[in-house]
C-alpha cells in the first residue's frame, strides 16, 4: 500500500546508517 514509504526507508537506511 505504501510503496513510497518503503523507498524512503531504503534511502534513509543508506543515508543514516
Curated annotation (Swiss-Prot):
GO terms, biological process: defense response; neuropeptide signaling pathway
PROSITE patterns per UniProt: BOMBESIN
Superkingdom of the source species: Eukaryota
Pfam families for this protein: Bombesin
Origin species: Glandirana rugosa (Japanese wrinkled frog)
Name of the protein in its database record: Ranatensin-R
Cellular compartment(s): Secreted
InterPro entries xrefs: Bombesin
